[in-house]
Structure formats: C-alpha cells, structure tokens
Amino acid sequence: MGNRKLPFGYQMRMGEIVRNEPEANTVQDIFLQYTLGASLKEIAEQMSKTGPSYDEGKSWNKNMVARILENAKYIGADSYPRLVDINLFEAAAEKRQTKQ
C-alpha cells in the first residue's frame, strides 16, 4: 500500500482536512463521467493518462474509481469538506446499484 492516508481529493493543512484542488476536480470529473455513462475501467484508463496520480507509483484501476464513487466523505460525511453535490453522488450510487 502507498502513502495515501486521506481519501483522494483531500490533504492536511495546519492540522485540518482541506480540499486538494487538482484532486478534488478529478473527483468531480469521475462522478460526472460515470453518471454520463463511462465505465469504471474507461474512467481508470482516462485518469491514468491525464489525471493526477491516485497513489504514488500506482496506476489508476477500476477498484480505485469504485472506491471514490462509494465514499460518502465526498458529500461531507465525517466532517470532511464536500467535494461532490449530493444529487451527483446519489445518481452515481443509483447507477452502481442497477449495474449489480
């Protein structure tokens, strides 16, 4: 396992969890791409080519994308700053349920 302690999209600054803007933008893009019909694999491939690194020395894969789509911290759970609109999060969750 790499060095990532916080979910992708966040960083610690002066003892506080804050947005990591480049990663936060990527998180929003992942949710948008997924709700518009892209597969987990397609998103992972795109992120490997153009997105910031998920974890040092690791390429993106569909499991990393799935973990992002399932993580309620992105809508502000557990006192994390919200990165994704709740409607977008719920649309992605609904799509994931219909695929199972």
Sequence positions of predicted segments:
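Conserved catalytic breakage-reunion loop centered on the nucleophilic residue
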Residues: 1-100
